[in-house]
């Protein structure tokens, strides 16, 4: 299974699948979609109304990766459960933090 994130010059782009009203804000590992792509499974407490779920996802990643909230943005999929999250920072450090947060064995 490939990592669900891509390294870029200024950070990483993470593919996520969001479950709103999931009971708690958490990362639940990595999942393979039917099309063969890997995504980080994320659940948030809030409903997908008025951008609340997107805000919760960006805040969750900011906290997990210890980056400012302003460095985490929804790059695509604003109204979809499948999203691309752009995170600015050192790509190597972000990749290591993502591996730890998703419990990937190196």
UniProtKB/Swiss-Prot annotation:
Q: Which family does it belong to?
A: Belongs to the UPF0235 family.
InterPro entries recorded for this chain?
A: DUF167, YggU-like_sf
Query: Which source organism does the UniProt entry give?
Result: Afipia carboxidovorans (strain ATCC 49405 / DSM 1227 / KCTC 32145 / OM5) (Oligotropha carboxidovorans)
NCBIfam families per UniProt? DUF167 family protein, PRK01310.1
* One Pfam family hit: DUF167
Query: Protein name, please?
Result: UPF0235 protein OCAR_4310/OCA5_c02140
- Coiled-coil stretches noted in the UniProt entry, renumbered to this chain: none
């Amino acid at each position: 299974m490939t990592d669900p994130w891509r390294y870029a010059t200024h950070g990483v782009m993470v593919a996520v699948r969001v479950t709103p009203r999931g009971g708690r804000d958490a990362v639940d590992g990595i999942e393979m979609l039917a099309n063969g792509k890997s995504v980080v499974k994320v659940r948030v407490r809030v409903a997908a109304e008025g951008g609340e779920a997107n805000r919760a996802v960006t805040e969750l990643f900011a906290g997990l990766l210890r980056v400012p909230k302003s460095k985490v943005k929804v790059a695509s999929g604003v109204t979809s459960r499948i999203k691309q999250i752009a995170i600015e920072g050192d790509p190597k450090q972000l990749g290591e933090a993502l591996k730890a947060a998703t419990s990937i064995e190196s």
